[in-house]
Amino acid sequence: MPIAASEWSLSDEASFEDEMPKLWGDWGCSSEIGRLRAVLLRRPGPEIEALPEDLSSVLFVERIDPVRARAQHDAMAELYRENGVQVHYIEQMQEHEPNGMFVRDLVAMTPEGAIVARPGTLVRRGEARYAAEALARLGVPIVHTVCGSGTFEGADLMWANRDLALVGISRRTNAEGNRQVRAELERMGVGEIVTIQVPWSEAHFDGLMTILDRKLAMVYSSQAPYTAVEALRRHGFKILEVTSEREVRYGMALNVVALEPGRVIMPLGENTETAKMMEDAGVEVLRVDLRELNKGAGSIHCMTAFLKRDEL
């Protein structure tokens, strides 16, 4: 017997974001510093054991020791757990994809769910499939997969807060990928979305700047894009300027992850001046040794996809 239209259960005015905790799970991110609740990682598997002779062909700078690399990755994951962060994993990666551990590039989180990347380098192009499989297994909604001629990597999206998002154009994220990401953020009602032209020398802009606290950012002064710094200042951020190329390049001084406002994890290495600058500004700095993993040209921020942060 047909059901009368008057008896249909019609949609209410609730937004997807409002319904997500009940129907999908407690996911979402709209800042770099809100209390971190859940992350997605890839513990390096067989893919790091048979690196080619030409390391540059897989974007690595040095050959890594698999046993030491996994031990350091496990220590990073345990530090997250000790600080109340749920750690989830990508369970599979093809054996020719050693960069799969740099999960930040594969997933960009939004208040409504994940944007799945399309890496800009051919050697990384297949990794996103396994990130998408992990998201589906966890119940994280995928709001968009970058497609067509677009390329985009998650490290080219930085949330200052819900009212300001920075989206790069770089060697890894092209104009079409930037457009697709901007369109999703505009649909979600983000107050201001600023396109950042990333210097040619950089893969992404997350190695040039980071958010440390509600109104505190740190930048590598000689390379930080003007439009990014200007946007942050316009929104009331104080800017700390790092000048040491050695600390930024080799110590990965800006490759940090905030656990909450004013409290960050920083890779151990040649970055003591930058760490002191953070501490002098009132930021608590935790250290973790990732020097073996850093030989793959990335560190903790590159290896961490945020799945859930508290709203500021």
Model-derived segments and their meaning:
Residues 1-312:
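The feature marks the mature, well-folded catalytic cores of soluble enzymes
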